[in-house]
Amino acid sequence: MVMSELRWHTASPEDNKNSLKRDLLKSTPTSAREAAVHIMQNRYISRLSRSPSPLQSNASDCDDNNSSVGTSSDRCRSPLSPALSLSHQQAKRQLMSLQPHPAHHHHNPHHLNHLNHHQYKQEEDYDDANGGALNLTSDNSRHSTQSPSNSVKSATASPVPVISVPSPVPPMISPVLAPSGCGSTTPNSMAAAAAAAAAVASTMGSGISPLLALPGMSSPQAQLAAAGLGMNNPLLTGSLSPQDFAQFHQLLQQRQVALTQQFNSYMELLRSGSLGLAQDDPALTAQVAAAQFLMQSQLQALSQASQQLQALQKQQQRQVDEPLQLNHKMTQQPRSSTPHSIRSPIAIRSPASSPQQLHHHHHHPLQITPPSSAASLKLSGMLTPSTPTSGTQMSQGTTTPQPKTVASAAAARAAGEPSPEETTDLEELEQFAKTFKQRRIKLGFTQGDVGLAMGKLYGNDFSQTTISRFEALNLSFKNMCKLKPLLQKWLDDADRTIQATGGVFDPAALQATVSTPEIIGRRRKKRTSIETTIRGALEKAFLANQKPTSEEITQLADRLSMEKEVVRVWFCNRRQKEKRINPSLDSPTGADDDESSYMMH
């Protein structure tokens, strides 16, 4: 030993290296291991001090097969890695390089087997001394030339006891969570935890590209995503099929389940003491904290990947739905415009209308026109006898006539039946309304008196509102044509009465021709009061049918012991109330504008 030390100090470096190898073979296993560790410490410390910065080194240096092992590993080393941070394969290659070939020195088979066993024992002792071969090399440098698919395969092939989770950074978890044989936390383990945290932070922004490496994707875009493209890549926008999205979601769920299972199994190993760590050991606390930190990091990465995938799926769905909705709107516009023009009642309206009247027709802007000659000429072109209009329907007697549709009007014209619209001119109707108002005022009758008198004389009850709308030309053309003959008859009877009395109006003379003479001069009918129980029965009937027929009204009046006219008026008022409560439920025909407005209590 003394001679070898002298030769070490006096000989050249290559001679010293060869002599050191010979001394290592002659020494015991323990001394050989210590010498190997000492040599590698000196070599790597010296080379680490001479090696350039990782930022200045080229990635191609890591893959240079002609360079030495130490130089290649030093160039690819992370700045946080200590001098003794060797992987298992690198340590084995270093230890094997120090051993001479057994065939050059031994020819006995028994002695050869013993030497091989001795060499294997040295490798195991070195692994134990270094705490499971901590590998703290940078994850980015180790995977600079490795495809994402290969990294996923290597992650799925990792054993369960050591947390090697299939995640965007699969090789990063094993070094930190590898069980060490030492009883206290060493600076190497703290540096390993720091390197792992830095690697997690550097890989958080990579998205879900490493997670999507599925070999059996059904589209080229999915293969690009599996090859590592991010979700913001324009090639993936709006091009993935629903099957691809389902496969992506399934893969993310599988990765999350596998990550949780492996984390739980590793925590059970730590708590059970199978790794040789006591419950009060500080190293156990450090291992648990590191495992929880990495578990949360991976779960966060999976959550971000799932959110990005859902956002992409929603964006693609919107891009598909927008053209369909646009086409649907374009096809629905011409269909909806034509029936609206047919159903809209075209009426003449003056500014003197009451607010209640304007409320019923606020959705027809073309109806509000001043009663002038110019407006009459304009409306005369629209309100021709052939114009299919539908407006307010008058209640003739006890029947409720239905509005005449375009088809029924055409059938009536084909059959030769003259309709009121065909026999009445618009200008003539306007002139009659003006004359009727002047004559009524001259005779001293109110609008309410005219309505009640017409009900008793001709069997048709009209409200004051109906007479007012007729004079203001606020009724539909169809209803005005129906009301004109009745008002004309009332004016003729009033003129005959005046002529019979010598030019002086005598209401008694008009009463002589009326079957019920007490009706003339009488005001509006007294308000009808309905009991609570009867009102509840009427409400139930209204909810079942808002527009009952004449026979149904008769049956309901008989069952409640009420007059049929009272029941009919109550339904009319109840429909008007429903329109005020729910304007959207207003019928487009406006068939209830002329209904009687008796007040109910």
Swiss-Prot record:
GO-annotated biological processes: appendage morphogenesis; dendrite morphogenesis; negative regulation of antibacterial peptide biosynthetic process; regulation of neural precursor cell proliferation; regulation of neurogenesis; regulation of transcription by RNA polymerase II
DNA-binding region per Swiss-Prot/TrEMBL record: 523-582
Residue stretches making up the POU-specific domain: 421-495
Gene3D superfamilies, alphabetized: Homeodomain-like, lambda repressor-like DNA-binding domains
UniProt-listed InterPro entries: HD, Homeobox_CS, Homeodomain-like_sf, Lambda_DNA-bd_dom_sf, POU, POU_dom, POU_domain_TF
GO cellular component, as recorded: nucleus
Residues spanning the membrane: none
Distribution of this protein across tissues and organs: Initial expression in cellular blastoderm stage, then in ectodermal stripes during germband extension. Broad expression in the neuroectoderm followed by limitation to discrete subsets of CNS cells, and expression in specific PNS neurons and support cells.
Stretches of the chain forming a coiled coil according to its record: none
Signal peptide segment: none
Primary localization: nucleus
Residue stretches of biased makeup (Polar residues): 135-157
Family label: Belongs to the POU transcription factor family. Class-2 subfamily.
Protein name (Swiss-Prot/TrEMBL): Protein nubbin
Natural source organism: Drosophila melanogaster (Fruit fly)
